[in-house]
Amino acid sequence: MHSRVPSIESIGWLDASLGGTVPWAYVLGNVINPGFLPYSAMCVYILALDFIAPLVTALCMGRFLLRHRYVQDKYMAVLASLLVFAPSMWANAVLFGNQSGIVCCCVILSMCVLEDSETLAGLLLAVAMCKPQVAFVFLFPLLCKKHWKAITVTSGTVLGSWLLAAILTESSPISMLTDIMDQGLSYNTSYYGLFNFLLGFGISTKVVLLLDVAVGGVILLAAAAWMFRKKLDNDWLLWYAVTAVVSVMWFYKQSHDYIILALPAIAIFCLPHISLPAWGSILILLVDVIAFAVPKVCTLLCGLPKDVVSPWAKLLETVAIMATLYYVFQSAKHHAGRLIC
């Protein structure tokens, strides 16, 4: 992606194969990666932010859990909120200076402050839109619950930043977006969502992503319908936990984007109606282990090329993800039924 504005001489043109960013992040991204600072200062800034952001998020999460009585005492609130630090992918994000951890913290914070300030929640979600593959789906619960102010603030901030980026780089706003989409479709180190395994069978990336979006949308709609029917639609932790699970399957991802799964981890810890049966948990764990081990075992012991085996391993991972969703909703359905009775 090139504009008519010359590159910075000390940096030069960047290799497109190293990745890119959405156009509005040229402006909004400076909150996380301040490009106007000297490189050495920026490294210190983002490293500090990688520690401060989850700490602030954990504190706000603890307050949120106590306020809504998800936990009964401060001790349990501390234990639950510390799960923000739990995802091992934090190490990946910090090591490579990736902003995913901070983006995920912004999403979680938007939930924590929503009832106090829709404007602040909208701004936090707008910053998180620097990685729309993580944050975009979180507009869905806001839409379902008619939080128009938060949606307007998020949309307006993103669109305004996009337009400003186009003006500053003297580029077409549309071409800026299509360029990064084309680049993303050829970025082979990414995990392309729920149907990623189809890539190994020769299916094009565009078809895979369309299937991801379609199935992710169906899951969100089904979850929303179920929550409204069971009168669980005021449970914001449940809304965000379900949406977080969908966020890792509906579009392309990299390992550090999975930090958002801290949300369902907290929900499982706190909500009595989201607990997996023991045998179901063991089954899911076994499928995950098998999916991880199959490529290595077949490559080392059987001499099969990893490219041949990986699609089947990804298929097993997909089964594990869907099994997780199934058991979560079955457990929630059972608990909701007991409450109604």
Predicted regions and their residues:
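Aromatic-enriched
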Residues: L271-C341
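Membrane-embedded alpha-helical segments of transport systems
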Residues: F51-A53, C130-Q133, G160-L164, L283, ...
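Transmembrane helices and adjacent periplasmic/lumenal helix-loop junctions
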Residues: L125-P141, F251-D257
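Hydrophobic alpha-helix feature that most strongly marks membrane-spanning transmembrane helices
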Residues: F251-Q254, F269, H273
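Primarily membrane-embedded glycan-assembly and transfer machineries that use lipid-linked glycans
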Residues: M1-L120, L142-A262, I340-C341
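Hydrophobic cores of alpha-helical transmembrane segments in multi-pass inner/ER membrane proteins
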Residues: C106, V218-I219, I260-A267, E317-Q330
